[in-house]
Regions:
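Catalytic core of non-heme Fe(II) oxygenases with the double-stranded beta-helix
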Residues: 81-159
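Non-heme Fe(II)/2-oxoglutarate
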Residues: 1-87
């Protein structure tokens, strides 16, 4: 048997969230009291990495996750089955990373998740972009913007 790697086209969704100010306020407030996890065995080398299922009952975050999930459902229609039905997406994990100068994320993917997303809470135009390793496409971070993508897509951020 032979395994052959191929590059393929994959769509990503980039959009703005109308309640970005509320999300920013909530995130910045909660980061002050969060319990960061160790990054020893992680691809993410950020100044802060919250726990994997951060604030699951927070209504502001639940609304953000629901909105992005609905946008993925609308534009990508994942989970389609041959009989015409669909399995709806679920948001399994939700965490925050704080990247300071010199921080980065090594190339990684979010398999086995069908989709994943990044949401930029606080950003400047010169911050490191979210880079898709297969295509080389880079997304410049902008406050209040999300980027949703298939979980198998390789992503990274370079140190700034």
């Amino acid at each position: 048997m032979e395994v052959i790697s191929v590059k393929h086209k994959a769509d990503i969704i980039k959009g703005e969230y109308q309640f970005a100010d509320k999300v920013k306020s909530e995130v910045l407030s909660l980061l002050k009291v969060c319990n960061p996890i160790s990054q020893d065995n992680s691809n993410v080398k950020a100044s802060i990495h919250t726990e994997w299922d951060w604030e699951p009952d927070n209504i502001t975050f639940r609304n953000l996750k629901s909105y992005i999930r609905e946008e993925i459902e609308r534009y990508c229609k994942p989970g389609a089955m041959s009989g015409g039905g669909r399995n709806m997406l679920k948001v399994g994990n939700f965490w925050a990373n704080v990247y300071n100068k010199g921080d980065y994320a090594q190339s990684h993917c979010h398999k086995p998740n069908d989709f994943s997303f990044a949401y930029f809470v606080k950003s400047k135009w010169y911050y490191s972009p979210l880079a898709f390793t297969d295509s080389g496409k880079k997304i410049i971070p902008k406050e209040g913007t999300f980027v949703a993508f298939p979980g198998y897509q390789g992503i990274c951020t370079h140190s700034s």
